[in-house]
Amino acid sequence: MAPFFSAMTSKKQSQGLPKGPHPDNAHRDGYDFSALVASHPPLKPFVRANAYGNLSIDFALPEAVKALNCALLKHHYGISRWDIPKGFLCPPIPGRVDYLHHLEDLLRQTPGTDGLPLLDIGTGANGIYALLAASRFGRAVVATDIAKASLTNVATILKANPGLEKRISLRFQSNPRHILTGVTQTNEQFAACVCNPPFHASAAEAALGTNRKLEGLAKSRGQRHISGPGKPQTLNFGGQDAELWCDGGERSFLLRLIDESARLPDLCVWFTTLVSKSDNLRPCKRRLEQRGASEIKVIEMQQGQKITRILAWRFESVT
């Protein structure tokens, strides 16, 4: 039997207008920098009026973006202490919480998911999905990663926020070729998994991507970005190897996740992942059909000019 496929869209989107963030996203209307500075004074030195007279920060400065994240997490989510080591991925909070809002909409429509934990695949040193799921939605979360340094940093964050330490558990994936296998337990079940796959196929490709983003930011400020030997490629999103690339890139990772989910069909009520490259949707849908998925959904999200998608699927229970 062919899987049931649906694309979750809004009336606003169907009319060709920008969809924008989820209606419940606290950051839908931008940032209240005055309130954020009051909650986190270290943000103040980075805040200034932009060309339009609005308060903002320079998003090309890693220190500024990290201070903004600290303020957002403290002001909106009660996470009093958050930090990442230099060079690790600094995630955009509005986009990350948008994923979780859409996921919670899906879970509310799905019987049998109340009280089940989430599985955060590749939590990274920032642990952002686990932290937001626990603080904003009250979910228990199992967070996994292939990098011990990332898990060590998340453990430090949890110790600084005792309320979250009780809801989030960390697991090391010892085999980097595995995603679900070996890091989950027999008869364990999750409401859903969340995942932000590595985007690039190699370290060189990741470096080129960073340079393009640097040039884009410089252009938006009317400046010229100079690259080459001796020019450090730093940017607020940073990222270590495991956070930015894997062999075969995003498509290869997604297909491996689909294959493993088919071997563990009852592990999650819904398997979900971000898909950054729209060209990867078709091969993923084809693989899901081949692996016997009973339902497939694509949920579109928009943050500014950037459009991403959540791919969600499930299998008929075999228990």
From Swiss-Prot:
Tagged with keyword rRNA processing: yes
Bias kind Polar residues: ranges: 7-16
UniProt-annotated stretches for the region Disordered: 1-25
First-level EC class: transferase
Enzyme Commission number(s) of this protein: 2.1.1.181
Disulfide bridge positions per record: none
InterPro entries: METTL16/RlmF, rRNA_lsu_MeTfrase_F, SAM-dependent_MTases_sf
Keywords: Cytoplasm, Methyltransferase, rRNA processing, S-adenosyl-L-methionine, Transferase
MF-aspect GO terms: 23S rRNA (adenine(1618)-N(6))-methyltransferase activity
The keyword Cytoplasm appears for this protein: yes
Location within or outside the cell: Cytoplasm
One Pfam family in the UniProt entry: Methyltransf_10
Superkingdom to which the source organism belongs: Bacteria
Catalytic activities: adenosine(1618) in 23S rRNA + S-adenosyl-L-methionine = N(6)-methyladenosine(1618) in 23S rRNA + S-adenosyl-L-homocysteine + H(+)
GO biological process: rRNA base methylation
GO cellular component term of the entry, any: cytoplasm
Family the entry assigns: Belongs to the methyltransferase superfamily. METTL16/RlmF family.
Free-text function comment from the UniProt entry: Specifically methylates the adenine in position 1618 of 23S rRNA.
Protein name: Ribosomal RNA large subunit methyltransferase F
Organism phylogeny: Bacteria, Pseudomonadati, Pseudomonadota, Gammaproteobacteria, Alteromonadales
